[in-house]
Amino acid sequence: MEFVMKQALGGATKDMGKMLGGDEEKDPDAAKKEEERQEALRQAEEERKAKYAKMEAEREAVRQGIRDKYGIKKKEEREAEAQAAMEANSEGSLTRPKKAIPPGCGDEVEEEDESILDTVIKYLPGPLQDMLKK
């Protein structure tokens, strides 16, 4: 019976003790290997960051060349200029600058109100029309 169990489980019986929390084989160089692995990871991360920074600097140089060629300003520069213009307009004012109202915007509303009132008066009987027109 013992033979059959050994054959069925194979070499798993040796690992069974480890899985259940038994004695593990300790590698004397495990700490050294872990330290080397951590150092390799740190170096790889530094190389990746350096490569990314170099690539981003090259891209920015190309972008700046295109901006210079076509006279395009950076978004930050445009925003700074717009902010400076807004501050220059409102230096003496305590409130924000008012938006310009296009001509004729408010005038049309009053005319429409009068025409609606006239239309309503037309449908009223004569004596009421006289009272409302006064």
From Swiss-Prot:
Any Pfam family: Synaphin
Phenotype when changing residue 128 to M: In DEE63; uncertain significance
InterPro entries, alphabetized: Synaphin
Keyword Thylakoid recorded: no
PANTHER family cross-referenced by the UniProt entry: COMPLEXIN (PTHR16705), COMPLEXIN-1 (PTHR16705:SF6)
Function: Positively regulates a late step in exocytosis of various cytoplasmic vesicles, such as synaptic vesicles and other secretory vesicles. Organizes the SNAREs into a cross-linked zigzag topology that, when interposed between the vesicle and plasma membranes, is incompatible with fusion, thereby preventing SNAREs from releasing neurotransmitters until an action potential arrives at the synapse. Also involved in glucose-induced secretion of insulin by pancreatic beta-cells. Essential for motor behavior.
Binding partners and assembly: Binds to the SNARE core complex containing SNAP25, VAMP2 and STX1A.
Protein name per UniProt: Complexin-1
Naturally occurring in which organism (per UniProt): Homo sapiens
Gene name linked to the record: CPLX1
